[in-house]
Amino acid sequence: MAQLWGGRFTKETDQLVYKFNASISFDQRFYEQDIKGSMAHVTMLAKQGILTDAEKETIITGLQGILDDVKSGKLEITDKYEDIHSFVEANLIDRVGDAGKKLHTGRSRNDQVALDMKLYIRDEVQETDTLIKEMLEAILGIMENNLETYMPGFTHLQKAQPITLAHHMGAYFEMFKRDHERMKDIYARMNTCPLGSGALAGTTYPLDRAYTAKLLGFDGPTMNSMDGVSDRDYLIEYLSALSMIMMHLSRFSEEVIIWNSNEYKFVEIDDAYSTGSSIMPQKKNPDIAELVRGKTGRVYAALTGLLVTMKGIPLAYNKDMQEDKELPFDAIDTTKGCLQLFAGMLRTMTFKNDRMEESAKHGFTNATDAADYLVNHGVPFRDAHGIVGQLVLLCLDKKIPLDDLPLEEYKKISPVFEEDIYEAISLKTCVEKRNTTGAPGVKPMQEAVDSYKKYMEDY
């Protein structure tokens, strides 16, 4: 067992206690962050005269060797060590001798792991944001090509009003755009360096915390050492943002699953993103979308788990906080994987434009426009609403859309109707009349696409 404590103990740690307490199986993810943090720390120690330049160079050379060997697979991280910090320090001492024993001067594992986690999450926020960008690009590509692809818009999963595929996709662009903005907010808010906070009360060494923060790309040091070692707000914020990403993906997945069904046939998922059945030869299943929908729960669980872990912890560091890793790591991996797969599925998906338009025509999505026609001819809206309701009932009985109802039938219910009712309730007219900002008409949607393109250029 390699651990960083033991001098005041008279007995060996029980093996079950050691295994229960150890974190090497999961915090080994931090090996690169831990080593880079140590390099910055010893550079600062030398600047402050706490270490000699020769000691600094010896330690940094040793740390770089460990980093290179782990990356190449030459050096394996094993459960011989309690955690990633003891792994790095023990291997450093083996390589450079007594100089390695000075690495931990002016530092505690409390501020060390707080730094490692911040460096790691900072990297993951940037990686997540890159994957969000891929989603936005895939969505924008669909929008550009479908400004006049008509389809039904839904409320209560029932056909409501005609829109375009571009308009529908634009709603998802807005969702993932907000996800991108959240990544920027999280990065900005978390970008302070806890190193130098010590166990909780700083250190008596003359550390230059601002210098260390600058070396590691932070905006500056944390301003309270107790908060520095015990803050996990940024991780909770990140998990909350991941949960919202997964919620957006899950909603999108649900629609893809529905649209892909034989009952809708709005889309066909590419073979590369579909699976089959072990017994039913005809099946082509939307398993990727279903799994994304299913995996959303485990990301929610990570957020809830960390909130519950942190809710009763007194200042400053407590061992409970070791539980801030496994579930969040899983949530991060899950969300990134889902984003990557979903973007690929979108890029290869076939949209059945004719089927969408036909569905819009046969769902009375133009009923509101028929009522508006009457209003424009002087009929009070409430009366117009009732008149069109009668027309819908008549069409249901005849099993035809409003577009196919003869004019004489219109006139039987209201003499206000004239031949121009058919133009007024055509899909093209219904959509194009909706030309305010954010509506599905070609003009506002082209403006939206142009705006989104500019947004992506500045991403």
Label the model's feature ranges:
Residues 54-55, 152, 222, 383, ...:
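A generic structural-conservation signal
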